[in-house]
Amino acid sequence: MNRIVSPIPTMLSAALCALAMLVLNPGCQSIAPGKSAVKPINIVVAADGSGQFTNVQAAIMSVPSGSRTNPVVIHVKPGTYKELIYVQREKRFFHLVGEDPEKTILTYDLHANIKGSDGKPIGTFHTPSTTIDADDFTAENITFENSAGAVGQALAIRVDGDRAMFHNCRFLGWQDTILLNRGRQYFENCYIAGHVDFIFGAATAWFEKCHIQCLGDGYITAASTPADQPFGFVFSNCKITGDPPEARTYLGRPWRIYASTIFLNTEMSEIVRPEGWNDWKKPETHQTARYAEFHSTGPGGSPKQRVDWAKQLTKAEAAAITPGKVLGGADGWNPNNR
């Protein structure tokens, strides 16, 4: 895998308006004088036994669920942790912090064709190596991996929580690497590798300066955006590359007919097909799918042969698409205000 060459310039301890501040104030305004920030809970996980726990899930389970409002910072030391990770809905404000995404790896190898206790295949949605059900989850410098390989659907991560953030992380898989099932998510300086539909789901998500690595002929996105949801996936200032060189991929295909996916200022190698988008043999999506680009560059970025049912945005239209507008929701969440 290609190394992430430019880690984000700030770490969680400094970048999130201080973790406790973020908890008390998601908009990241200053805390009023006289009000103290809550103290975070710090836990160290180390595979070599030098921390409080040797596996991540044990550290997660050590913190009681309930109405706790102080953030939990789990420092994961370098190592490969082969385990299923589950952050339950009641465990809000969890932060997984590694030291280097290439050295701190959370991995498992379930896939959809494995037989369950009833003798039937377990299916896509029971395969995530990591599952995030809780709101206000953050990860930094971590690799999330499904190591099953080219055997069918095999999720590296499933996110159902709202206001999740991932900084300088890697997501490694083959088919269905990342499922963003609901809520809002923000990815910055991340590396995402896969083959077929490897970023999919109904959530609203912003990807900033991410490297998308295509592992063969396939599809990058498969959004299932609800009709009444203004945005699905937005990629801004990203880079798309591929291996092997002769492979070709689509930017997306609609898992549901109102799929919404936008690429802004994204560099696209020749792996991106000239037509750009695929309709999944659903011609009705030509009227309903919301696919758009602005200023795509590189050999795969030319608009000349794009399908006529996808849109090329004007400069003004693109400028209006910001993290605050896309992710704001009812609470005004804006990760850029951290």
Predicted regions and their residues:
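N-terminal secretory signal peptides that target proteins for export/translocation
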Residues: 1-8
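Small/flexible residues
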Residues: 5, 18-19, 292
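Intrinsically disordered, low-complexity segments enriched in proline/serine/threonine
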Residues: 9-11, 28, 66
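Bacterial N-terminal signal peptides
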Residues: 11-26
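Sequence-level preference for short, compositionally simple segments enriched
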Residues: 31-338
